[in-house]
């Protein structure tokens, strides 16, 4: 079980931003910007290559809700995901980073 699965199961605490039945968003413990959030599906998906178009549409809507809640929609932000170890993916569970446009 990876660290994100342990967070989903409640075995590891996190600073939740938003949660619904399919997704969870929380603050990154090693922020790279003033605002650095993660968005993960509760379903076990290794990376972006494993997501279905339907789930991606739902995740996109959830990400928009998180951005609104963080108050960074108008100020600008970065949205990224790393796919595979060679691209820098450290946790083998699909996750998106939301980073405010300003540097930490």
Curated annotation (Swiss-Prot):
Gene3D superfamilies: HIT-like. Residues 3-104 form the HIT domain. A motif (Histidine triad motif) lies at residues 93-97. GO terms for biological process: D-alanine catabolic process. GO terms for cellular component: cytoplasm; cytosol. GO terms for molecular function: adenosine 5'-monophosphoramidase activity. This is Uncharacterized HIT-like protein HP_0404. It comes from Helicobacter pylori (strain ATCC 700392 / 26695).
